[in-house]
Regions:
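N- or domain-start disorder-to-order transition segments that initiate the globular core
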Residues: 229, 239-243
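Structured alpha-helical segments in the cores of large, soluble enzyme domains
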Residues: 246-259
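Acidic/aromatic-lined carbohydrate-recognition and catalytic surfaces
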Residues: 1-228, 260, 267-290
Length: 290
């Protein structure tokens, strides 16, 4: 029976191994259930875990599956339970999120496009594109100042780069001059020349126009953004939990922990942000009680 919880924020500086150390103390306090912040893979360095980027695995910064199982076993041996916070409403987006990256790369044809609450037809001139309000100025000004460039990795991968942010390219749109870099590191200089000068700027603009996303001035977010966010936080994108397939794919790991009797209870963060909160809770309860 749940009578008293004690909440802990788990992160790289306070991982599961450290949590285990205080189980005897919590037991002596009379705590019935330990309540943990989200444990699914979040952005590297996240101190809270609510910016999940991969719901299919445990956050490697907080520990291993064996350490989670050991913590649950120690709690259960002490007559205590484990409650976990989960975040079905949104995910952190960016290069760390392989599902979002796949959507930016392949557009609405991506198998993960159904995960995200994107209105692909919101703008007639931008139909089929995700609007990313990430620029500090209008795109033309950004190009004029040379702030948008190519990012060529040591392995030969090519992305668009805007200061610290990078964006994927649809492989079908990458011209031969840039494709060569993947096979010949010596072609890097030629690739860099490809974007120099006025002609290079025009080529870069044409390349960007062929992507499944639009880089826009951040001030345009309120009127132009076409994906649901967590309030007005641009890098937390809403998920389509009313879609049964999305529910299944994003909850498989958590439900595995429940089925294996590692997790004894779930707390749902921001459930009111979902399209159908009641429907979600009914579905979740049914899955948990299987």
């Amino acid at each position: 029976m749940l009578t008293a919880t004690y909440r802990l924020q788990v992160h790289k500086d306070f991982p599961l191994a450290r949590v285990r150390e205080i189980v005897p103390y919590l037991n002596a306090l009379g705590i019935s259930h330990l309540y943990l912040s989200p444990l699914l893979a979040a952005r590297p360095g996240s101190t809270h875990g609510y910016d999940v980027v991969d719901p299919t695995r445990l956050n490697p910064e907080v520990g291993t599956e064996d350490e989670l199982r050991a913590l649950a076993a120690e709690l259960h041996d002490a007559g205590m339970g484990l409650i976990l916070d989960i975040v079905p409403n949104h995910m952190g987006i960016g290069p760390e999120n392989p599902f979002w990256e796949n959507v930016l790369t392949h557009g609405r044809q991506s198998r993960y496009a159904r995960w995200f609450d994107i209105d692909w037809d919101a703008h007639p001139k931008r139909r089929g594109k995700v609007v990313l309000p990430a620029l500090g100025d209008e795109l033309a000004a950004v190009l004029d100042k040379g702030e948008l460039r190519l990012d060529i990795s040591e392995s030969g991968g090519v992305r668009l780069k805007y200061y610290d942010d990078t964006y994927p390219l649809d492989p079908a749109t990458v011209p031969p001059e840039l494709q060569l870099v993947q096979f010949d590191p010596g072609a890097k200089q030629a690739a860099e020349e490809w974007v120099r000068g006025e002609e290079g700027k025009a080529r870069l603009r044409a390349l960007l126009d062929r992507q499944h996303y639009v880089l826009a001035f951040w001030r345009c977010a309120p009127s132009d953004i076409n994906y649901r966010r967590f309030f007005d936080v641009n890098d937390l994108a809403g998920l389509r939990m009313a879609d049964p397939a999305v529910f299944d794919e994003t909850h498989a790991k958590v439900l595995e922990w429940v089925s294996d009797e590692i997790i004894d209870g779930l707390r749902i963060d921001h459930v009111d942000g979902l399209r159908d909160p009641l429907g979600y809770l009914v579905r979740l309860r049914a899955e948990v009680q299987r």
